[in-house]
């Protein structure tokens, strides 16, 4: 499957191209800069996104189930409909993020996320 090829993904990130609907399940993408990218409906289940930059990204309806978001920056990210069940979020920053439900905010806070007040 072409969109699971890491070189393909990194080329799109580098060129700042849309990643809408992409399948990135279980990939190691720590420290990658996804800032301001379109990641709507992306499947990021089980991804390691520790220290990744997702500032201003559109993660509407993205699947982040069991994603590792430790120390990731999701400031000003659009997260309406995003699934964050089981996400590890210690030290992750969500300052100015939009679209999170009250229950998701409480869950993320309980996991050590910041910027959710």
Language-model region placement:
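Tandem repeat scaffolds
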Residues: 1-117
């Amino acid at each position: 499957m072409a969109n699971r090829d890491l070189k393909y993904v990194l080329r799109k990130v580098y060129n700042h191209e849309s990643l809408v609907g992409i399948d990135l399940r279980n990939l190691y993408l720590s420290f990658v800069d996804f800032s301001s990218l379109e990641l709507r409906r992306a499947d990021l289940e089980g991804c390691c996104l520790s220290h990744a930059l997702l500032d201003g990204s559109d993660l509407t309806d993205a699947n982040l189930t069991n994603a590792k978001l430790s120390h990731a920056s999701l400031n000003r990210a659009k997260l309406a409909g995003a699934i964050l069940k089981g996400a590890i979020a210690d030290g992750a920053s969500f300052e100015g993020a939009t679209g999170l439900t009250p229950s998701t905010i409480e869950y993320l806070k309980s996991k050590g996320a910041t910027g959710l007040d």
